[in-house]
């Protein structure tokens, strides 16, 4: 916790307690593996760790190409999230796109929820220096961050 001064017109005490980000429990992006085979296929494995030591993992594969590689990475991440939430949301990848903007590579993903409360479409992005495929997985985590935070808080 950290404290902020209370506004002067407040009748209560001098400080307001604000929960810091470290006070919230979060899934950790613990493991990412991506490989291409000589026959032109690719596969991705994603591992997410929880504070109690448990792990949720997901994998996906497909025919390798620059765009399919990004999609496979995003799908593996969504499968790991489905494993963690026991399919509470039914995440589905709508699309993934790599764009060049402001002299940087940006990965953008769109994810839909088949069930559960909250918005039905989520959007996430990740600024990427080199590893676009890993950036795709991180963009999925950015898209689903608020939904997962609510899921974790109500467990």
Predicted regions and their residues:
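Extended amphipathic alpha-helical scaffolds
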Residues: 2-35
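Mixed-charge, glycine-accented linear interaction segment located at domain edges/termini
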Residues: 57-59, 115-155
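Short, solvent-exposed interaction modules
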Residues: 78-132
């Amino acid at each position: 916790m950290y404290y902020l001064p209370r506004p002067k017109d407040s009748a209560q005490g001098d400080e307001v307690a604000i929960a810091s980000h470290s006070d919230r429990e979060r899934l950790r992006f613990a493991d990412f593996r991506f490989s291409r085979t000589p026959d032109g296929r690719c596969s991705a494995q994603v591992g997410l760790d929880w504070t109690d030591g448990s792990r949720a993992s997901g994998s996906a594969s497909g025919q390798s190409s620059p765009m399919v590689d990004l999609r496979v990475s995003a799908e593996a991440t969504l499968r790991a999230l489905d494993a963690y939430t026991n399919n509470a949301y039914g995440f589905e990848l709508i699309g993934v796109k790599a764009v060049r903007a402001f002299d940087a590579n940006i990965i953008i993903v769109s994810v839909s929820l088949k069930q559960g409360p909250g918005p039905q479409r989520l959007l996430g992005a990740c600024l990427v220096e080199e590893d676009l495929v890993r950036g795709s997985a991180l963009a999925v985590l950015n898209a689903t961050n608020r939904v997962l935070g609510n899921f974790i808080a109500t467990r």
